[in-house]
Amino acid sequence: KPYDVDDCRVRAEQGDAEAQFYLGVMYHNGQGVLQDYKKTVKWFRKSAEQGDAGAQFGLGLMYADGVGVVKDDEEAVKWYRKAAEQGLAKAQFNLGVMYANGQGVPQDDEEAVKWFRESAEQGSDEAQSELGRMYSNGRGVSQDYKEAVKWTRKSAEQGYHWGQNNLGWAYENGQGVVQDYKEAVKWYRLAVGQGNSFAQNNLGHAYDNGQGVVQDYKEAVKWYRLAAEQGDAEAQNNLGHEYANGQGVVQDYKEAVKWYRKSA
């Protein structure tokens, strides 16, 4: 609910956990006060220690990013866990990521899957996408392409660019679905609309090979270049290949070598 700063401060100093959280947010965003991350941490902590899930998650983020406090992954995990156990989907997702990457906790794919699933079942598009990826790669679960597609599709249909890219990949490769290049291109297009470099490279590949679209080397080069300029190594290699072969561009070995080098 909207508070004005003075009202919020009075309530926060009286120990109102919700007001403490909102005051922390105000300091974070510089709303009605000078932006001050240390004060954000101070008020998030007071609220979090009273059990406010939003503040626990916020404090976890501050520790994970090292903003207003010294970066500390173990502290981030501690606060994410408190919020996750209260059912906060964002915290469940972030806790899953920490387990998947072994940040602040020993790496544990099964724990990652557990938290991704909790978050995904609450509708988190990011968690649905990651859970799909875990099924696709057989990480923390038995590999199951159909289950991968189920979760990836939920994410994609919510408009999440990784879900869209990964669903396109499933259609391109016939993993968990009947292979369908046109359907792959449809999902890649949605993901490139959000600037996803993997999808840009994948769409370039579709044009390069005439899969789901009419073969068009110039279009291939366009999408490879967009991905390559974002640092995508595979796209850099593909762009080098186009220059080496004069496909969609004037043949230029120097340019080819330049992009091959970047990709190495």
Which residue ranges define each predicted feature?
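N-terminal segments that cap or nucleate solenoid repeat domains
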Residues: K1-G30
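Short helix-capping/linker turns of helical repeat alpha-solenoids
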Residues: E13-D16, N29-Q31, D36, E49-D52, ...
